[in-house]
């Protein structure tokens, strides 16, 4: 069992309010007939959220490339030749201008990513200044800066950060096949520091990295058994980038991705489930099925860190076709 202060993967000990999800139980959900599974997930979604409201987030890379990690999916690793140029941390003014544009286009949350294994104390000083400036615009803020040292999460919280993104990436059993420079437990430990500091958690994973269905179930089990569950769960479809070890990963059938969205919704009923990276390669019909299966958040903007994303006009047209609307204070409903 892996534990971390204030945030842990639960054991089989009954919890007073949250259900324990075994891998076998989640595998059984995956085996549910497709339309029955989507229908069940849609019911759970409607019990907990306004099904027409989609939370819009914009993601910006504020420090690009040169990461020392060896994540097999990531074009920002310094170990791979992917054409991504290393850039230093951007100036506050440039980031604030991008945040203003994001807000004007309807985003309610501004997410900032930095390609570090983990920030140094001097980096935290700069990042906290950025967070304060973005918060002054009236946006929610989210940061993904890697593994945190003691005290850093508290500094981020004090600066006004709302969410910290730290994905589990994949199941514990598959982790070593994808990443060799850190351990699954390292992720759990940083999540513990984030929770202890009082930050909200954004934590999900990537689908399509040659994992088995059982390993997909293992990822969802790891997420659903975090106590408390993440407020936001981004489900990414692998974006294959030439030069990375996973550039030739096997294709994942679209129904398997929709199944994963549905299972995430059923097992984490009160979490926002974000349809995240990989949308550029999805048809409108596939995205519609994901929304039906319980996805209620997207990244909005033409770029996700260093990979593509659907154009904003295209997202607006799709949402209009599906009678969906951006989430606001007025249309937000979330069950307690």
Swiss-Prot record:
Residues 52-279 form the Radical SAM core domain. It holds the Pfam family Radical_SAM. Gene3D superfamilies: Aldolase class I. Transmembrane segments: none annotated. [4Fe-4S] cluster binds at residues 67, 71, 74. Binds 1 [4Fe-4S] cluster. The cluster is coordinated with 3 cysteines and an exchangeable S-adenosyl-L-methionine. [2Fe-2S] cluster binds at residues 111, 142, 202, 274. Keywords: 2Fe-2S, 4Fe-4S, Biotin biosynthesis, Iron, Iron-sulfur, Metal-binding, S-adenosyl-L-methionine, Transferase. Its cofactor is [4Fe-4S] cluster; [2Fe-2S] cluster. Signal peptide: none annotated. Its EC number is 2.8.1.6. Pathway: Cofactor biosynthesis; biotin biosynthesis; biotin from 7,8-diaminononanoate: step 2/2. One of its GO terms (biological process) is biotin biosynthetic process. It comes from the Bacteria. It catalyses: (4R,5S)-dethiobiotin + (sulfur carrier)-SH + 2 reduced [2Fe-2S]-[ferredoxin] + 2 S-adenosyl-L-methionine = (sulfur carrier)-H + biotin + 2 5'-deoxyadenosine + 2 L-methionine + 2 oxidized [2Fe-2S]-[ferredoxin]. GO terms for molecular function: 2 iron, 2 sulfur cluster binding; 4 iron, 4 sulfur cluster binding; biotin synthase activity; iron ion binding. SMART domains: BATS, Elp3. Belongs to the radical SAM superfamily. Biotin synthase family. Catalyzes the conversion of dethiobiotin (DTB) to biotin by the insertion of a sulfur atom into dethiobiotin via a radical-based mechanism. HAMAP family: BioB. Homodimer. This is Biotin synthase. It comes from Pasteurella multocida (strain Pm70). The gene is bioB.
